[in-house]
Amino acid sequence: MLRIAVPNKGSLADASIAILKEAGYNQRSDSRDLILVDSENNVEFYYLRPRDIAIYVGSGELEAGITGRDLLIDSSAKATELLALDFGGSTFRFAGPIDREWAVSDISGKRVATAYPGLVAAHLSSLSISAEVVRLDGAVESSVRLGVADVIADVVSTGNTLRQAGLKIFGEAILTSEAIVISRTGFDIPAELEVLIRRLQGVVTARRYVLLDYDIPKINVETACAITPGLESPTISPLQKPDWVAVRAMVLRKDTNRVMDELWNIGARGILVTDIHACRL
């Protein structure tokens, strides 16, 4: 039976359970449950601390898991990213006191507080910068004011928390992270894991795209197909009205309204948008 690690708490937990449910897997209904056996799909799910998942997978105790890219890299575990899941996005950045200008080179000889010491140490080493990395498990942004560190490296979303702590971001992003599926490096992927990856990829794609249907005069079909090329090509069907055809194509969800406007402007009518709940491409 395939053994999969799932985050048991934090920002990744609910979204991980949601995508697994959409992919057809049973999930726990009680947050106190540590294990769920999905006999129908021949999978056991283990609910673990997100930071520990890469360790379990890398050691071979579990075949795969869902965790953050930042947590995988920080762990130095022998695990490999298989699939990005399009949620749990964050950026990992340096930040220093707002009362001076900072460059990454200024970190040399300084103290850097972070909850991701492995990731930060590896990044500084790649830049040939020598600095003391101070590990903290939380409230990293308070470390400068309390005199524990000179700068910090932390996950940033809006930056509001940093500004409230008197800090500002500097330098390029250290890492862009999101939720990912991982497996042990060099591990021969079993059939059950291939199915899970294929299902999750289908959900990710379904969330990313919508299905667009519209009618268009034949004379404008070429222009319309350039606007909605689809993944392979659009489906074109004849209509009872001889000078018109029906077109169906997948369109990126984020582009939906712009595409509808462009189609309307070239004479398309009956433009309909349908959500995609699952797919295999």
What are these regions (language model features)?
Residues 42-61:
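Short, structured active-site "lid" loops
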Residues 1-43, 47, 67-80, 85-91, ...:
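Small-molecule-sensing regulatory modules
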